């Protein structure tokens, strides 16, 4: 199960995609609870400094907790996601989907910073999942998915 915490840009889209994201979690990790938490630029910068020693904001950070009630948490900064979307000539919605799936794969044990083989497999899976979910969502967007609130 996925819980979307935090409000603002992206929260409605993630709620609309929750079922598909839960399928990925179940396939990659199992029947576990994952929190996706939308945070400000200052909050993600503080977390990045505290846990990675990087004094800058980032788009996504993943923390495996492996507790009984929550397996892990994925922190996402919509502002940085939006900046990256512009930089990579992507839509905000697709970039948001990419970072959340990226976080899910990190929770599943994939690592792209230290293992080349694992990195290749991770990004191949990420691309496959993004295309599957994005394609389905684009062909059947929910009636209540207001682009201004996604």
From Swiss-Prot:
The keyword rRNA processing applies. The keyword Cytoplasm applies. InterPro entries: MetalPrtase_cat_dom_sf_prd, YbeY, YbeY_CS. Pfam families: YbeY. GO terms for cellular component: cytoplasm. Zn(2+) binds at residues 102, 106, 112. GO terms for molecular function: metalloendopeptidase activity; RNA endonuclease activity; zinc ion binding. Its EC number is 3.1.-.-. It is an enzyme of class 3 (hydrolase). GO terms for biological process: rRNA processing. Binds 1 zinc ion. Keywords: Cytoplasm, Endonuclease, Hydrolase, Metal-binding, Nuclease, Ribosome biogenesis, rRNA processing, Zinc. It is found in: Cytoplasm. Its cofactor is Zn(2+). Its main location: cytoplasm. Single strand-specific metallo-endoribonuclease involved in late-stage 70S ribosome quality control and in maturation of the 3' terminus of the 16S rRNA. PANTHER family: ENDORIBONUCLEASE YBEY, CHLOROPLASTIC. Belongs to the endoribonuclease YbeY family. This is Endoribonuclease YbeY. It comes from Thermotoga maritima (strain ATCC 43589 / DSM 3109 / JCM 10099 / NBRC 100826 / MSB8). The lineage of its organism: Bacteria, Thermotogati, Thermotogota, Thermotogae, Thermotogales.
């Amino acid at each position: 199960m996925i819980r979307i915490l935090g409000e603002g840009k992206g929260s409605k889209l993630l709620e609309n995609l929750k079922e598909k994201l839960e399928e990925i979690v179940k396939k990659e990790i199992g029947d576990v609870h994952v929190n996706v938490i939308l945070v400000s630029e200052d909050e993600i910068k503080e977390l990045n400094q505290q846990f990675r020693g990087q004094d800058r904001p980032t788009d996504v950070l993943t923390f495996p907790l492996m507790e009984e009630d929550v397996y892990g948490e994925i922190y996402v900064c919509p502002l940085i996601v939006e900046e990256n979307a512009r930089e990579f000539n992507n839509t905000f919605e697709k970039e948001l989907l990419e970072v959340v799936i990226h976080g899910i794969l990190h929770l599943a044990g994939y690592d792209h910073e230290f293992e080349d083989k694992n990195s290749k497999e991770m990004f191949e899976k990420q691309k496959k999942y993004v295309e599957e979910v994005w394609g389905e969502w684009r062909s059947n967007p929910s009636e209540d998915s207001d682009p201004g609130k996604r």
